[in-house]
Amino acid sequence: WKAGKQVEVTADQKVSAYYPYNVQYTDMTAIPVDITTQEDYMYGEGGVSVEKPSAVLVMKHALSLVRILIKKNDYTGDGMVDAVTFGGVRLSASMDVTSGKLLPTGQPGEYKA
């Protein structure tokens, strides 16, 4: 992967990145996150200097996967789970790419998985 344009490095600088990229987002401290899209939001940071002008970025996941395990135990019926709904969940947030911190936005709601 290569950057869209060459940038001269004249001093030590931090380099930040996020995924999925959107050209409309210009504030690296306020990237919109919407969990209903099921996107794998990621962020990363590295550094460059005059001596080392290429950055190595280690991307981290901004969100967690929730895994639900339902055990049958002694139940003898067919049993079928149609859906699982999480309540009191913030469905959107603003991500600071430089730290990975998420600031919840909007009101809590329900999310049907």
Residue ranges with predicted function:
Residues 75-107:
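Short, ordered, surface-exposed loop/turn motifs in non-cytosolic proteins
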Residues 1-85:
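Short, low-hydrophobicity acidic/polar segments
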Residues 59, 102, 111-113:
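Short beta-strand element of the conserved SAM-dependent methyltransferase core
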Residues 2-3, 108-113:
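Short, intrinsically disordered, charge-balanced linker/junction segments flanking boundaries
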